[in-house]
Amino acid sequence: MDSLYNTYLKMLTTPFDDPSSDLPDISPEDYPALFALADRHCTLPFVLPYFRNTGLYSQILQKSKHMMLNYYQIDQFTRRTVSLLKKHGITCFVMKGISLAASYPVPEYRKLGDLDLYINDKKDFQRAEQILHKNGYLDEEEPCDHHTTYRYTFEKTGRSFLLELHYRVVGVYQYKPANPVSYTHLRAHETSAHL
């Protein structure tokens, strides 16, 4: 592993409250490459303090703010969608994305792209599809063997988000044994983080 990557990893593992501790000196010409690494790995908010006195600081700050805004918008989308299904007696489980945010030092730093919900019961899944259609969720064409995709656009902002409604945990060719998940097993491991 090269020294630049080691510096990047050190930036990620150094406590936020002491960004100067044990970091090697960073030469000015290394900052663009460190920025590119953090951007590629969606970790810009974590390295922001180290760029405070550089010309890249405002760009990283702006991208970090955008990530955090996106987090709150997807959080709102998640709450809206789960509440809608719950109101109709449909139990669903949040997968990946926002459900992992609690594992981060700052939950808002978790980069999010869409909402993944899993519905174990086939009849509930079919009902959910009808409910979503009636409430403005539009089909989004995507070839997939384990979920259907919907696009929802908030009227006030015009911002749209994708929902992947899973009827299997993973694709049949990814890891088939993961799919026969029982409702009892899901209930035993259900968490209410962020919802």
Where do the protein language model's features map onto the residues?
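Conserved NTP-donor binding/palm subdomain of two-metal-ion nucleotidyltransferases/polymerases, i.e.
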Residues: 1-113, 119-187, 192
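Cytosolic catalytic cores of cyclic-nucleotide second-messenger enzymes
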Residues: 195
